[in-house]
Amino acid sequence: MLLSILYLALFIYVGLLLARRAVPDGSVAVILPLGCGFGVSLLAVLPAVLALALGFTLPAVLLAAAAAGVLGGVLLHRGVRLRGMAKDADCGALWACILPVVLITLYLLHTHVLHMVNGAYHTGQSCYGDMPMHLGFIKYIAQSGGFLPCYPLLGGEHRFGYPFLCETVSSVFLVLGADLRTAYLLPMLPAFLSVYGMFWQLTRRVTDSAAKASLAFYLFFMGSGFGFVYFLGSAEKFADIFTGFYTTPTNFVEQNIEWVNPIVDLLIPQRATLFGWCVLFPAVYLLWRFCYEGKRRLWPWLALLALPLPLLHTHSALALVLLCLVGGVYTLAQGARRETLLPWLGLAAVCGAAWLAQMLPTVLAQSLDGQHMLRLHFNWINGQDDGTLKDNYFWFYIKNIGLVYLLLVPAFIHARPRQRWLYGGGLAILALAEFVVFQPNNYDNNKLLYVWHMLGCILAAQLLVDLFAKVRALPWRALGLAACCFAAMFGSVLTVGREIFSDYQHWSANDIALADYIDANAESDALFLTSDSHVTPVFALAGRRILCGSGSYVYYHGMDYADEYSAMAALYEHPNESTLAAWDVGYVLFDSSVYGKFADADESWYAARYPVWYENDGCRVYKIK
């Protein structure tokens, strides 16, 4: 564990040096979160590049550290130092603003990620679905050593079309000897600091106000719509928020409420979003200074920061492209000159080449030939397949987003010209996301919509602060702001409260014992026959390939898994040796999830032919070869 901490510290230190070099006028409150963004970006890039030649192995991981050390040495040799940073009178305002959210985040990470309770792993509501997939990907990449990795949730050879660099940033620590919980959590800590700190710094830079930055921060991270109204009818209905499964004011499908809280429903459970925003938010900060403040020297630093973005979070990469396109139009509108256009061409050339190299064999190929991927669809999850809408277009967003949505038009009118151009990039994102879906799950277009919403929160916060500044009586000013904050945030407060109290068993002691035995004794490339339960410990905890993973994963990754599913069912209900050989199955698991799905599972056929390889009170595993 100590080696992993030192490894992460090296990358963060080099990231801080890069941030200091990129923004020499930055204060500690800017350099620290910006440096975390650079550090995580390096952590994604360097091990992956070296793994292309060496596999995802210890030599590749150590050489990546050496490369980071060389980069840090070059920066130090060129006189870059962390001391002597600019003073910032608003530094305290940043930390006072983000500290409550940071504490909540740390507590939820502690209770939601492999939290040991009486010998079993527990989690919370938001992580019950997604986290097993992320754990399995992280473990598989580390223990298999192959790179580019194959898709481990289906038998045979399948393209890994998921943005897997959000997993490799944890896999490196498994290779270094850390346990799975430590490896999972370590890179998330600087990532959260980057997301929170750079959102605040971006807003402060755009609005030139710490007060507006703080209000925008809470409008975004703790903002919500009017979904709480549906729970005010009775004490019993209100109590459902804290006892039901996904019956919260920000996630209540029954009433078409699905504008979720960014912290508990996006950043904590969805690693791609976290690591995407960890790079995107500082990138937008640099983009603002590069494009709208005329700091043309920043383009190489923006390009360097954004290098791994497509395979960290493809939606964030697309959002950044659209923001840059609008920024480029703004630059042209100011007058096309050689000194203003060349930096844009450099940024486009570097990112275009690097991004295409990453995307062509992975996410782009998957988008083009995957199942139910790129297609037309109107109005996010409010739109239905027959072209009709569940709710009126505007009412849907009013009740989901709430006050911020109602203020968008007056806030845009109130904004300064450069701010309108920046928000114009958000409108481009909205327009694309409302008409084109990039994955089988329409819901996942919210990864684009939240970037538009982020920019809307900045304008709304500016309008509210300026509006109430005109109220001379301090009590009325405070009362008005408090009322707006209540209307804009009460739903998220309840949602976060529900998440804090949620507690579910993820894996039993028997599941953990099975995973430990597999980890120690099974071949790294072994294929297991299991049920398609999303929590099967064979994949989630031991990182081994399985014949057919949960449809809630493989379908939404655009995979055609009909053959694997049929083979799984046949091998449990009507097993035969030729099908086992055809799929190269090495082990067969029988546990409660198998019998829950296949009541006629024929374990006796395996017992008569193959030895029991492992057994505990919850399962038996037969070794086929």
Q: What do the PLM-derived regions correspond to, one by one?
A:
Residues 102-279, 314-318, 504-505, 532:
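Active-site lumenal/periplasmic loops and adjacent helix-entry segments of GT-C-fold
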Residues 264-267, 286, 298-314:
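Membrane-interface alpha helices of multi-pass inner-membrane proteins
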Residues 472-625:
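Extracytoplasmic
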